[in-house]
Amino acid sequence: MIRAVLLLLATAIAAPPATLGVDPFYAKYLDAGGIPILSSAMAPDEALAAAHDIVADMLAARPDLHAWLVQQRYRVAVMAADETTTDLPEQRGWTRPAATDPRLTRCERLHYAERIGRLTDRQYWDARARGMAGPLTSAAAENLLAGPRDRYHGENIFVHEFAHDVLAAIRAADGRLYARVDAAYRQTLAAQRWQGEYASTTVDEYWAVGTQFWFNSGRIATFDTVHVLSDTDLTRYDPALAVTLRAAYGDRHHLLADRFWDSPDRVPPGPLPRYTAEVC
């Protein structure tokens, strides 16, 4: 049934309208309630349809946030498996982050020279990212479709990246809710939750990782005897975060077009490590 809906959506794909004023790189277009879903001719139609449905479902409970993203001209670009982050016209000139960039993880800061400093700008971004948030949010077709070349197999990276956009809308359009998200993040740091995990890096990553678990679409996180894999686990482990996620997404925990929803691939084979945080 879900595949049939995606295939039906795919038949609505057309060339981008001239009014969008996009680069000729973009040959395909779907409209997600005013948020353009774009790609080159190389991306499969079904991947655009999946991105469309995920956007619609993540914003369903908050039309005000949807309206803000439309007003700010947010758009989504789906990369084909053979395309890279810097193939996208808006990202061709991206440079590497500096060693002082607050978005770097502690391991990236510790090993900056080896992991980042020795690479060209293009080498860094093409190795680092198969999806980015922002006014142009990108997604990888192979991840949206859980394909064989998916380097992030086991989690939906687009759910994570679009969650950043949702938080940007909250920050601008619902200051009270954003204050609650920020307070939850400060509380979680003080309580030493998510220690060493990507969620501890910034309030933005805290929200995006939490969103993945809210929608049962993130790789398992382990903290000794505590495991976080589902929305139920998340609510138990970080109730303050769960309350704010509910305020944005309602009680929905399943994005129908998400291939990794409740997937066994979210748990790696073999014995689980005591802690999934990177050791550096």
Model regions and ranges:
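Short amphipathic alpha-helical segments with coiled-coil-like heptad repeat character
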Residues: 3, 65, 216-219
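Acidic/His-rich structured neighborhood in mature extracellular/periplasmic domains
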Residues: 25, 32-35, 44-186, 224-227
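Sec-dependent N-terminal signal peptides
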Residues: 2-12
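A very general structural signal that marks isolated residues within well-ordered alpha-helical segments
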Residues: 6-7, 61, 214
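Metalloprotease/metallohydrolase-associated module, dominated by Zn2+-dependent proteases
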Residues: 21-24, 38, 94-103, 110-140, ...
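Short N-terminal segments immediately surrounding and downstream of signal-peptide cleavage
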Residues: 16-31
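Intrinsic disorder/low-complexity segments
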Residues: 10, 14, 121-124
